[in-house]
Amino acid sequence: MTFYEAQQQLQKALTELYDDREAANIADWVMEHVTGLRKIDRIMHKQSPLAPEKLDQLQEYTRQLLTHKPVQYVLHEAWFCGMPFYVDENVLIPRPETEELVEWIGEWAVGSRPSYAKASAGEAIGNQQSNTSPTLRMLDIGTGSGCIPVSLKKKLPQAEVYACDVSEEALAVAARNAAAQETPVHFLQVDFLDTNNWSSLPEVDIIVSNPPYIPQSDKNTMLQNVLAYEPHLALFVPDNDALVFYDAIARFAQRSLSSHGCVFVEIHEDLGPKTKELFESKGFKAEIKKDFQGKDRMVKAILSS
């Protein structure tokens, strides 16, 4: 079977589950993963035969994909902020909306902390003066794959970055990604909703979290590939306490956020005003930011002076 025939066969099979465009995109991704060749190179060699072991691999991937398993879990790869991250079913698949959260944090860190921005620039050019600048400390709560802290460390290399999760398996994935990207991150296994554990977490300048925020009742509206494969622990909260994690984050920030620090959280698109009100009720100035689809997706909160 040639490269071209293999891709056409895969794409046709995927149209049982996806529209034509998405099926084509997934087929491209899988073929690049199997062959190690970019699309342009595969086109130039479309009549080349696919090696038997590669064909076996492709058939196994196809079998998994036809069970609605997300392609990121099949290939154990998801792209985030221009970097490949290892993912498996112990962690959520990183979403483009979360990249916007990372961008917002980076902009705030540079814009509100000019001394830190200079320090980062100084490190890039080997300026020894940067060693005297204050260290920016940040904590990602519920880190999952580690995509947020790893990406922030890449953007803000002088930052001291911490990340916690209740899941030992998720932390193993996050540590693997930090090592692959050569980004030192301090990982901690913590049940964040247990306030007795807060003393083990550092005081920081930035708290970031993409916590579970989907009410259990929303399961009926969700795609099968999400429900069947992504970890429910990282997705769902009780219908009667949908803001449980945001309440805990706000209370933790009251005690562990530096005086000029900031909280950034990803939110449910329907709960923006309620999340903002929650932070404001605990003494924060809060702001909602929409994502690229025009949906309420992020909240920034700063303690009122």
Question: What function would you assign to each model-found segment?
Answer:
Residues 14, 109, 178, 253, ...:
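Conserved hydrophobic residues forming the short capping helix/wall of the S-adenosyl-L-methionine
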Residues 239-302:
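Conserved Class I SAM-dependent methyltransferase catalytic core
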Residues 30, 68, 98, 148, ...:
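Residue-level signal for inorganic ion chemistry
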Residues 100-121, 126-221, 248:
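Conserved SAM/SAH cofactor-binding pocket of Class I
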Residues 213-244:
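Mobile active-site "lid"/loop adjacent to the S-adenosyl-L-methionine
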Residues 29-108:
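Conserved AdoMet
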Residues 1-43, 47-50:
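Non-catalytic accessory regions of SAM-dependent methyltransferases
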Residues 213, 302-305:
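C-terminal beta-strand of the catalytic ATP-binding
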